[in-house]
Regions:
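Nucleotide-activated donor-binding/catalytic signature segment of Leloir-type glycosyltransferases, i.e.
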Residues: 101, 134-136, 145-168, 172
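Aromatic "clamp/platform" in nucleotide-sugar-dependent glycosyltransferases that forms part
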Residues: 189
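Short alpha-helical donor nucleotide-sugar binding micro-motif in glycosyltransferases
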Residues: 175-181
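A conserved mid-protein helix/loop that constitutes part of the nucleotide-sugar donor-binding site
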Residues: 102, 106, 111-125
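Carbohydrate-associated surface elements
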Residues: 50, 73
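Nucleotide-sugar donor phosphate/pyrophosphate-binding loop at the beta->alpha transition
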Residues: 3-4, 15-36, 53-56
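Short hydrophobic beta-strand element within catalytic cores of glycosyltransferases
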Residues: 206-209, 219, 226-227
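A short helix/loop element that forms part of the nucleotide-sugar donor recognition site in Leloir-type
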Residues: 80-96
Length: 263
């Protein structure tokens, strides 16, 4: 009807084939709807340069001039250090998190793209004196939840010093948690930008993150954290071509950053 169509791209179905586990036949429908919408859009906004490349790879019929990059941002005032009497700090007591231990934090949904199973493998090679806090919930499927539970139980038995928070924390508690930890980990295998890294850095945390998607546009290797190199299959899954190397490189980066988080 002559009304311009503008799309902001935060993810792409062709690069998330694991969504079929969650959506079943609905994945075919969402893939068709996305392709049709993109190819008829007057403008497509990508949240990173990496995302722009993915869009043009997934939908080669798109006019590249119609695809522009506008990075996501955050509201810095939402990530200020809580006052000493802020009730958000109670999250440490409720989950028995020792604020005197060096602590690594993960925040994310339990989904293939967030790379949690790789992190749980990597933590076997991380200094056991480092306390690990996993804020991980909202699993895509029962199958991946069981996979994570099994890996967590094995890790907990082997090294301990790990806390798993399954509930989605209210913002004041999550903000306090991020301000009270020492470093942040983002092991994603698909991440168009990675707002969690912006939020962690806004709280003063150095970040260890996979060098995939838009993450290298957010985390400056050697300055605001460490990037973990990862070669990936080009079959849409993003699976690391050498999972063992990815896992060990991640563990090495975690140990380095936790050895000197102020660096």
């Amino acid at each position: 009807h002559g009304t311009p169509l503008v799309i902001t791209a935060h993810s792409l179905e062709p690069f998330r084939p694991w969504k079929r586990e969650q959506l079943g036949g609905g994945y075919n429908l969402s893939s068709w709807a996305e392709k049709d919408a993109y190819e008829h859009a007057d403008r497509v906004i990508a949240v990173s340069a990496g995302m722009r490349e993915d869009i043009l790879t997934a939908y080669p019929n798109l006019d590249p001039d119609k695809v522009v990059v506008v990075h996501n941002g955050i509201t810095m005032s939402q990530f200020e250090t809580p006052a000493d009497d802020d009730p958000g700090w109670k999250v440490f007591e409720r989950y028995d998190i020792d604020q005197n231990k060096p602590t690594l934090l993960f925040v994310g949904r339990i989904t293939r793209q967030k790379g949690l199973p790789y992190l749980l493998q990597a933590l076997h090679f991380v200094d056991p004196g480092i306390q690990i806090v996993l804020c991980a919930g909202a699993p895509d499927t029962p199958e991946i939840m069981e996979e994570v539970k099994t890996a967590f139980a094995k890790l907990d038995e082997e090294r301990g010093n790990i806390i798993w928070i399954e509930e989605m924390l209210p913002k004041p508690e999550l903000n306090a948690l991020e301000h009270g930890c020492d470093a942040f980990i983002c092991p994603s295998i698909y991440e168009p930008l990675g707002i969690v890294n912006l939020e962690a850095m806004a709280c003063g945390l150095p970040v260890v993150a996979s060098a995939t998607g838009g993450i290298p546009e957010v985390v400056v290797d050697g300055e605001t954290g460490y990037l973990v190199p990862v070669d990936q299959l080009h079959d849409g899954t993003g699976t690391p071509t050498n999972p063992d190397k990815f896992v060990h490189d991640m563990a090495d980066a975690i140990n380095r950053i936790m050895d000197d988080p102020e660096k």
